[in-house]
Amino acid sequence: NEGNVSPERVRALTQHFIDKGVKGVYVNGSSGECIYQGVEERKIIIENVMAVAKGKLTVINHVACNNTKDSVELAKHSESVGVDAIASIPPIYFRLPEYSIAAYWNTISEAAPNTDFVIYNIPQLAGTALTMSLFAEMMKNPRVVAVKNSSMPTQDIQMFKAAGKAAKGEFVVFNGPDEQFVAGRAIGADGGIGGTYGVMPELFLKLNYLIAAG
């Protein structure tokens, strides 16, 4: 009620996901209202997630801020607490050229040299889409291992999956929009990252099991 992050509730929620059989968590993303959180608040959140989840869940921490300095600070901190990967949307508000977005992402990635990097494509909110030319540029970064795709055309999943595999051999694509989970998995998404998964994890775990079982 005082507007502060509750470490106890962060830990309890993380344990809840473990108890439900969830395989991984995406921290400080859209559902976590990352844009409205300060750097120190986001550090507190990921520290308390890792206190419970380390070694039990795959943890991806979203580190993007609207300035590179804060994003780099969060990337370094993420690596120090042992996350499995960091993720980032492009800078928002001003539409930057692709070379600037690539420089932003690569600078963040370089700040966590031993940690995988996930591109977060959400053009309807970020204002910038992940084009194939920008994607190809990011494939030069050895730490880029996945895309979380929240664009509305579901076929983008197939496009990024095919291009990623061609560039790297193995490449992960996560379906973003919750309402497209089944369609996304059916056309090649390796998993899903979304908001309602945290509210009803049993449903989505069951759907994922049935899809995998054919």
PLM feature spans:
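Catalytic alpha/beta core domains of metabolic enzymes, predominantly
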Residues: 111, 123-214
